[in-house]
């Protein structure tokens, strides 16, 4: 059998409630861990290799949901030639848990990097947070403060050595059937907890506990430490990741049907927790 390998780019979606985040961690269930398990069960990647070759484009924390994320994996070229993409997807999907969907797969070059994307799109369902009040038209003004290129230290859990400069391409209300359910934020890349800390700042402004001037100052003066808190992960969705040669296809259609706002008892859980 030939030792030649083919590198594949795949896309997945999942509900995050049952997972301790996307990346493999010891002794807990993760999305990446489930994917590796399935590929090993199928015999498509080695069970003995210490470092698996399956990587994901964007990390997500425990409880965060994903509409479209991506990743890469290397498999035998002989295997890839012997199976159609449709059968490949079905084989993987049949062994995955019901809350992970394997969406598509294609061949890419070995220099193709899933972590270098044109942009990532996140949406946060603000109405899920306890005591949320829709502030009306002023929400657009508040969200626009987060657009542009700036040091996002005050809106992230900054990891050592991580560049805090981020570019936010757009930040706007998320409206479904005339109802403002939250906001959408688009950027090239995000820092850890950046979207959830942005969500909590918006929530605090809506409650009147902080002012837009305080938020603007936190953006303009990253050297002065400010902590507005972090919103719960339950209402965060990685809506999509787009690459230059792989836009989000039309088949992953816009979701225009949403349940009513969550009941207060559901919304209350972990709302005001800080990290």
Residues covered by each model-derived region:
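Structured-RNA-binding interfaces characteristic of tRNA pseudouridine synthases
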Residues: 2-275
């Amino acid at each position: 059998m030939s030792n030649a390998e083919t590198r594949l780019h795949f896309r997945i979606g999942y509900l995050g409630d049952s997972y301790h985040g996307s990346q493999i961690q010891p002794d807990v269930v993760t999305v990446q861990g489930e994917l590796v398990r399935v590929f090993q069960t199928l015999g498509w990647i080695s069970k003995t290799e210490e470092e698996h070759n399956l990587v994901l484009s964007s990390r997500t924390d425990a409880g965060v949901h994903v509409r479209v994320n991506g990743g890469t994996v290397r498999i035998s070229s002989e295997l890839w030639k012997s199976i159609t993409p449709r059968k490949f997807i079905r084989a993987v999907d049949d062994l995955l848990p019901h809350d992970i969907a394997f969406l598509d797969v294609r061949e890419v070059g070995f220099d193709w990097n899933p972590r270098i994307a044109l942009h990532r799109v996140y949406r946060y369902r603000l109405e899920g947070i306890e005591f949320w009040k829709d502030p009306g038209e002023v929400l657009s003004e508040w969200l626009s403060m987060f657009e542009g290129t700036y040091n996002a230290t005050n809106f992230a859990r900054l990891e050592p050595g991580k560049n805090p400069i981020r570019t936010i391409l757009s930040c706007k209300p998320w409206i479904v059937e005339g109802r403002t359910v939250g906001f959408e934020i688009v950027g090239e890349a995000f820092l850890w907890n950046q979207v959830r800390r942005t969500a909590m700042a918006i929530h605090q402004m809506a409650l009147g506990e902080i002012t837009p001037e305080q938020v603007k100052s936190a953006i303009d003066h990253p050297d002065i430490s400010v902590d507005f808190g972090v919103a719960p992960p339950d209402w965060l969705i990685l809506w999509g990741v787009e690459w230059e040669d792989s836009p989000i296809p039309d088949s992953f259609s816009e979701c225009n049907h949403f349940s009513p706002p969550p009941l207060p008892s559901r919304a209350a859980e972990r709302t005001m927790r800080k990290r």
